[in-house]
Amino acid sequence: LLMIIDGSNLAHRAYQKFENLKASNGKKTGLIYGFMRLLNSYIIRFNPTYVLVTFDTLQSKSSNFRNNLLGGYKEHRKKNNLSMDYEQFNYQLRSVKKMLKYLNITVIWDNKGLGHESDDYIGKFALESKGKVLIISSDKDFCQLIDDRIKVFNPFRDMKLNKRNCKDVMGYSPEECVDYLCLVGDKSDDIPG
């Protein structure tokens, strides 16, 4: 089993959940603690053969080619996260990446600033893998990848999505996912329908 973790998704979840956690020296450590705690729980729960963690680039969203296609792409996130301490977030995220490296967990991210997101790498590796794949993310876009080999675990729902239950849970099948999102849009990414 290849377990692919949407590291950006997990990092934001950990940062928000443990935002006030600090080390004895006063430095914030909530993202680090939360990320490693959740990662450990997924490894214990799903017992993967291999773990891959992907991240969005730390660079500005303006360099993302998606902004050239749709000017308002993810615009509300910038407005909603004005109070977020990005310097602290990025510091902790760099620490998480170092820890993953020491644990021999493969980390993939756009270190060349090409505008690729974590999602791009998840899709690529899930589709290219020959064996079973479990994607860990709350991002509904991954439902389109679900088939006999690929499943998605949504941590917010604490539920594994597969071909049998996707339509009941999400309201659309994996084959209908792209059409559905094109029709209704995606508020989380500021994409109109």
Give the ranges of each region predicted by the language model.
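Noncatalytic, basic helical substrate-engagement surface that gates or grips nucleic-acid strands
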Residues: L1-L134, F142-K160
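Surface-exposed beta-strand edges and their flanking turn/coil or helix-capping segments
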Residues: F18, A126, N165-K167, G193
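Short acidic/histidine-rich active-site segments
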Residues: S137
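Helix-hairpin-helix
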Residues: K140, L183-G193
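A short, charged helix-loop
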Residues: R157-D186
